[in-house]
């Protein structure tokens, strides 16, 4: 009963909120700009993390936007921000011949989930008294890798494959990527 209740709650929430993209056998429909991209136009798909720089009064932080990038043959790529890795799997299901970075994106997501799970376990089950300085430094190093190094590697690999289109935000420039932003 819990599973059915959760499923219904999720369906109702997403029905109210709406969707960003719709993936079908014909192609990918982008709701925000009312554009249908046929599979024949799609050169490749990738799921990358693009760092967004946010600056508020006295506060500055990076946020990793999980982004689906749709590379088109004769046009600029399209970035759909804050979207799940599952969209890449669904696209691969409908168009198996399309080039993707599904393996590397899946590994990066597993690292993210594993690291967050480790922190959750340590804080809520093992307790703070079992944590020592070595674990704290390990967390700091792994979060540095996750937040800064991994997104840079992901975008540089995609830029090497599809041309220099994806760039991270800096303190001086936002949305530097040469793409259509959604």
Residue ranges and their predicted role:
Residues 1, 15, 19-22, 29, ...:
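Sequence-level detector for tyrosine residue identity
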Residues 1-16, 46, 125-132, 136-138:
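N-terminal first transmembrane alpha-helix
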Residues 72-182:
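Terminal and domain-flanking low-complexity segments
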Residues 31-89, 182:
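Non-transmembrane, membrane-adjacent beta-strand/coil modules in membrane-associated proteins
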Residues 6-46, 152-173:
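Conserved beta-hairpin
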């Amino acid at each position: 009963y819990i599973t059915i209740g959760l499923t219904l709650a999720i369906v109702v929430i997403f029905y109210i909120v709406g969707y960003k993209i719709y993936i079908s056998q014909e192609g990918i429909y982008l709701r925000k700009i009312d554009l249908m991209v046929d599979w024949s136009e799609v050169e490749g798909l990738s799921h990358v993390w693009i760092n967004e720089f946010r600056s508020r009064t006295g506060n500055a932080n990076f946020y990793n936007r999980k982004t689906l990038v749709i590379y088109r043959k004769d046009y600029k790529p399209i970035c759909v921000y804050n979207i799940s890795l599952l969209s890449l799997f669904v696209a691969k299901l409908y168009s198996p011949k399309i080039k993707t970075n599904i393996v590397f994106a899946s590994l990066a997501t597993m690292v993210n989930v594993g690291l967050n799970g480790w922190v959750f376990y340590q804080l809520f089950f093992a307790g703070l008294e079992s944590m020592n300085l070595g674990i704290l430094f390990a967390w700091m190093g792994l979060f540095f890798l996750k937040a800064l190094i991994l997104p840079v590697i992901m975008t540089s690999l995609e830029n090497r494959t599809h041309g220099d289109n994806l760039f991270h935000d800096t303190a001086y420039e936002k949305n530097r990527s040469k793409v259509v932003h959604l």
